UniProtKB/Swiss-Prot annotation:
One of its GO terms (molecular function) is peroxidase activity. The keyword Protein transport does not apply. PROSITE patterns: GLOBIN. It comes from Chelonoidis niger. This is Hemoglobin subunit beta. Involved in oxygen transport from the lung to the various peripheral tissues.
Amino acid sequence: MVHWTPEEKQYITSLWAKVNVEEVGGEALARLLIVYPWTQRFFSSFGNLSSASAILHNAKVLAHGKKVLTSFGDAVKNLDNIKKTFAQLSELHCEKLHVDPENFKLLGNILIIVLATRFPKEFTPASQAAWTKLVNAVAHALALGYH
């Protein structure tokens, strides 16, 4: 179980309240597919992923990014029970999709970059530390199905 200070919870929830899940989720997933092209193999049904421009404008990428970030919002709502919150998604990604758990860390790091660029005033070092703790907790919870 992750232990959160009241300040960490505040940094996370106050910034999350400003996040446009569709835009941030789409950008984060698109960046993952561009920066780490080997992750594209999990999205072969998404059509044209041949260039950065194609990925950034791919409706399926953007829609799935929204879906991913909507699920991430469940972590924000359940900070004290992240493992249970992601138990089913962990099983799906492990047993059916066979996603390398390192990819969860990569996406978390990209999410931090996207948040920092979209909210430069709010994304202080203390906020970054809280968000880093959160994305690491989510990545760990998603990887539990591999143990």
